[in-house]
């Protein structure tokens, strides 16, 4: 499929080929296009994509696309600019001025605590699709972005490089939420995300230790062993198990047992957390295939 030949008819054919609903694939097409347009601007130098899965067929099969979530990070050691409405408006105006594939874009901006939300509507072939971009300030300033390749699902020859929020920092944030909120966790998605990262990624345990220590200090959460013990006890906690099962059904994802999910998270977290509680240093690389540190 050449870049200048994408039509509504061809998108419908791809919908049948990929076994993805037309509405979902249309949303994926516009979100991917929006991402490429962002990467063509100078604003992209300060934006680190936080989503772990956003531009692949499995993501497009889901009922709704998650917002593109960026962290407003450093630009190669340059002085950090303030993340404010002026910056956000300039960003939104530039990406929405583009008319690639004859898509028309409109936007509005909203502030939500420290974050900015850019609500964008893309109109293509007389069809309108709402999309959302969330931009958050960088909290842990020692974090460094990772380079990732974005390969278009729709155009074989189209690709670009973008900055990805570092996996260890992202994972540490998930673990901090688990330990901070315990049974009051707002969404079980945090457990899902953490479990899948530990299943797929080799992780630098020292980085997790440093980031988790920073987050605890930043929000005045004292590392105590009773927190990890309480978390481990949730394997027989009916309330948490039912919440997990409800989440799995709603998301339509692989039905991994609650006990399996919690076991892997505790296995990873306990050595790091215990070292923090004892004010000891921690070294070790997590090996997902072995489910242990080396």
Language model segments and positions:
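Structured mid-to-C-terminal alpha-helical surface segments
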Residues: 1-47, 55-68, 72-294
């Amino acid at each position: 499929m050449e870049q200048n030949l994408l039509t509504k008819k061809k998108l419908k054919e791809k919908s049948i080929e990929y076994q993805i609903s037309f509405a979902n694939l249309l949303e994926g097409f516009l979100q991917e296009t929006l991402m490429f347009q962002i990467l063509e601007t100078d604003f992209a130098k300060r934006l680190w994509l936080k989503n772990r899965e956003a531009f692949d067929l499995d993501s497009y099969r889901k009922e709704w696309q998650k917002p593109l979530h960026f962290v407003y990070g450093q630009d190669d050691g340059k002085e950090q600019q303030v993340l404010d409405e002026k910056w956000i408006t300039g960003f939104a105006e530039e990406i929405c001025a583009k008319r690639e594939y004859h898509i028309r874009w409109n936007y509005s901006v909203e502030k939500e605590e420290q974050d900015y939300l850019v609500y964008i509507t893309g109109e293509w072939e007389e069809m309108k699709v709402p999309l959302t971009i969330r931009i958050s300030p960088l909290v842990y300033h020692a974090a460094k972005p990772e380079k990732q390749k974005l390969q278009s699902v729709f155009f074989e020859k189209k690709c670009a490089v973008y900055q990805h929020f570092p996996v260890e920092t992202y994972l540490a944030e998930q673990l901090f939420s688990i330990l901070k909120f315990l049974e009051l966790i707002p969404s079980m998605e945090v457990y899902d995300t953490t479990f899948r990262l530990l299943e797929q990624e080799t992780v630098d345990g020292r980085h997790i230790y440093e980031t988790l220590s920073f987050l605890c200090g930043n929000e005045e959460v004292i590392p105590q062993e009773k927190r990890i013990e309480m978390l481990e006890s949730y394997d027989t906690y009916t309330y948490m198990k039912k919440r997990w099962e409800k989440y799995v059904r709603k998301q339509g994802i692989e039905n991994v047992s609650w006990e399996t999910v919690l076991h892997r998270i505790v296995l990873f977290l306990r050595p790091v957390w215990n070292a923090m509680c004892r004010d000891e240093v921690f070294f070790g690389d997590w090996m997902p295939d072995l489910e242990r540190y080396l």
